[in-house]
Amino acid sequence: MSRTKETARAKRTITSKKSKKAPSGASGVKRSHRRWRPGTCAIREIRKFQKSTSLLIQCAPFQRLVRGVERQKEGLRFQSSAIMALQEATEAYIVSLMADTNLACIHAKRVTIQPKDIQLALRLRGERH
């Protein structure tokens, strides 16, 4: 096996514990925290959620909502698998509605969605008169 060439390393200076501590005058100066540019975290979140296949609505609150509707109707019962199917369908509907809403917002030359964008998306789908 051939030998690999080693490069010289810079020497480390050995310092005592006392010299490692910052001087008493410099301890009051705080370093500023680096912030991300506006929109960077949002884009990172969007990419993260688009990659994942997990459910976004928490299971317990959604199940409580379904059970509340179930209590209003007599003789209506749901299996846990039926509730999971309802949750999948609900999330798919909300995601597609938000995609249409975003298109309406972009069409209006805005970047922030507003209630009127959701109303327009619902009207174009024929779900609201």
From Swiss-Prot:
Signal peptide: none annotated. Residues 1-36 are annotated as: Disordered. GO terms for molecular function: DNA binding; protein heterodimerization activity; structural constituent of chromatin. It is found in: Nucleus; Chromosome. PROSITE patterns: HISTONE_H3_2 (PS00959). The nucleosome is a histone octamer containing two molecules each of H2A, H2B, H3 and H4 assembled in one H3-H4 heterotetramer and two H2A-H2B heterodimers. The octamer wraps approximately 147 bp of DNA. Core component of nucleosome. Nucleosomes wrap and compact DNA into chromatin, limiting DNA accessibility to the cellular machineries which require DNA as a template. Histones thereby play a central role in transcription regulation, DNA repair, DNA replication and chromosomal stability. DNA accessibility is regulated via a complex set of post-translational modifications of histones, also called histone code, and nucleosome remodeling. Belongs to the histone H3 family. This is Histone H3.
